[in-house]
């Protein structure tokens, strides 16, 4: 197959998306950017350079209208594929496929459906308001996914209630057949009227809690540019990103070389692969093996559920004992030695690792020690780690969080409410939050908020000179802070120190790990006319 570059693929996906978005709008359907594509729109105004795909979503009502409109008026050389239209297809969500191209995926390239260059379309299913009914619906949806997908095992969480329903459903399937079991699960999972719901569950590859979306976060949608195409995004798109990626979504990941496992061709239709190559493959045998192995994997999950959680719990004990050997957490109110910090870090890293997360296992370290770890991580700015350990603690123990942990959690939430308001460029909200939460905000976020407000209020040269002086003072307390230096550079540009401003902004663009700061610095250079100077 002919080679193509990532830029070729991005250009192809963008053309597909623009065509489909225009079609959707013409048919009174709203699809919005999601996952890495939404993150790219907000942080890069386009594709994330190290990403590989394009993701969009639709609420349940829009999704149903989309499928109906497609049946009546499809786009040429395109197909929408999912388990309902293509029996045996392994995904609950849909894909928009370009049938003039080829994209061979491990599980779906068996002539089950057209398999070309594609865009994921994730439907958002309404969830019940009642907490118990909501959990029941989420479990039913996960088990429904497991029993309709005969190719891949869900690698996400295995909480007890979901395992119980899976075991019960497998027994019922042997007795009553698959059709009845799936109908029962479908009724539980998909029966909540959208007008009555306050949250959705997003149908991705079988995910659980991380994909619950509050209805008010979606709101009435906004539009942001994605590679120049104005696109729908959730009204509270920053909170949406926080729910999916954590509070540090603004930062670039340390590993930007994500794996890629597809074979693609932009010029050869998938039919050519089916007719010319699949004749050498035993399709029926492979699909039969998939079903056999999937059934064994489900039984294996249920068998391991009696052993693996306890094994995880046991494996956490050495890290727990190393922490507890330091005595009582109350002894370290005035300071924590490095070896205790290291022991707490090791325990938390082990606790939030994939296997304890998968089985919802808690290693037993007391809340007092967890509170101490949270305070240490807070001082280091490791906010995602704190939120992960708090989430794991909440999932695993049916007990309310103590005040000592809630205090740290509330501080983090207060900090990021301010940063969210700054990124929304909502000066009134920033002022309100600073007045409301000033007592719990740390010095750095207070400094960022003050410089933001002073910059928004600045009009003449004297105002900008005051901003520059405030930034210089702040840098004495927080040397090398990218956001403070950016505010300083903008102030310098307004008081005639343009060469310094240009160099500072260029340096921030090159070195900063905060994508929103980089984006703002690029905008600053353009708005201040500094790009034209170089």
Predicted regions, residues:
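Start-of-helix register in tetratricopeptide repeats
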Residues: 368, 412, 446-450, 483, ...
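Short coil turns that delineate tetratricopeptide repeat
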Residues: 397-398, 442, 479, 513
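Active-site nucleotide-donor binding segment shared across nucleotidyl transfer reactions
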Residues: 21-54, 58, 63-64, 216
């Amino acid at each position: 197959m002919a080679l193509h570059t990532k830029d070729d693929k991005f250009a192809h996906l963008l053309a597909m998306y623009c065509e489909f978005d225009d079609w959707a709008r013409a048919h009174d359907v709203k699809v919005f950017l999601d996952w890495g594509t939404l993150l790219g729109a907000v942080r890069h105004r386009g594709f994330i350079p190290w990403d590989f795909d394009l993701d969009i979503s639709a609420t349940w009502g829009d999704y149903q209208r989309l499928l109906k409109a497609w049946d009546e008026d499809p786009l040429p050389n395109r197909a929408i594929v999912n388990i309902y239209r293509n029996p045996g297809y392994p995904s609950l969500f849909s894909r928009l496929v370009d049938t003039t191209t080829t994209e061979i995926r491990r599980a779906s390239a068996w002539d089950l459906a057209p398999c070309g260059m594609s865009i994921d379309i994730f439907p958002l299913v309404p969830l019940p308001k009642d907490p118990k009914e909501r959990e029941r619906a989420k479990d039913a949806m996960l088990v429904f996914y497991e029993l309709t997908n005969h190719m891949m095992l869900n690698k996400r969480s295995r909480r007890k209630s979901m395992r119980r329903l899976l075991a019960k459903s497998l027994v019922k399937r042997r007795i009553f057949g698959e059709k009845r079991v799936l109908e029962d699960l479908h009724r539980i999972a998909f029966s909540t009227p959208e007008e009555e719901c306050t949250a959705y569950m997003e149908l991705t590859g079988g995910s659980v809690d991380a994909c619950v979306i509050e209805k008010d976060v979606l709101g009435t949608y906004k539009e942001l540019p994605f590679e120049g195409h104005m696109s729908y995004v959730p009204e509270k798109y920053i909170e949406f990103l926080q729910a999916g990626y954590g509070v540090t979504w603004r930062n670039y990941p340390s590993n930007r070389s994500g794996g890629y496992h597809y074979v693609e061709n932009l010029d050869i239709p998938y039919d050519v692969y089916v007719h010319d190559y699949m004749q050498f493959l035993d399709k029926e045998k492979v699909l039969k093996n998939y079903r056999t192995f999937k059934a064994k994997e489900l039984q294996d999950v249920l068998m391991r559920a009696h052993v693996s959680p306890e094994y995880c719990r046991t494996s956490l004990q050495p890290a727990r004992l190393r922490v507890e050997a330091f005595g009582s957490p109350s002894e370290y109110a005035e300071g924590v030695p490095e070896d205790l910090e290291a022991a707490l870090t090791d325990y938390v890293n082990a606790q939030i690792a994939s296997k304890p997360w998968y089985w919802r296992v808690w290693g037993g370290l007391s809340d007092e020690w967890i509170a101490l770890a949270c305070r240490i991580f807070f001082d280091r700015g490791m906010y995602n780690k704190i939120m992960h350990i708090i989430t794991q603690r909440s999932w695993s123990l049916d007990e309310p969080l103590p005040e000592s942990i809630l205090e740290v959690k509330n501080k983090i939430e207060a900090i990021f409410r301010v940063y969210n308001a700054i990124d929304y460029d909502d000066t009134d909200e920033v002022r309100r939050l600073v007045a409301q939460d000033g007592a719990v905000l740390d010095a750095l976020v207070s400094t960022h908020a003050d410089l933001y407000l002073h910059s928004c209020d600045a009009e003449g040269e004297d105002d900008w000179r005051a901003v520059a002086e405030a930034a210089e003072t702040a840098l004495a307390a927080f040397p090398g802070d990218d956001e403070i230096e950016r505010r300083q550079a903008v102030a310098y540009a307004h008081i005639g120190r343009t060469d310094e401003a240009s160099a500072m902004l260029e340096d921030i663009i090159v070195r900063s790990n905060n994508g929103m700061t980089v984006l703002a610095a690029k905008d600053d250079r353009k708005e201040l006319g500094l790009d034209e100077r170089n």
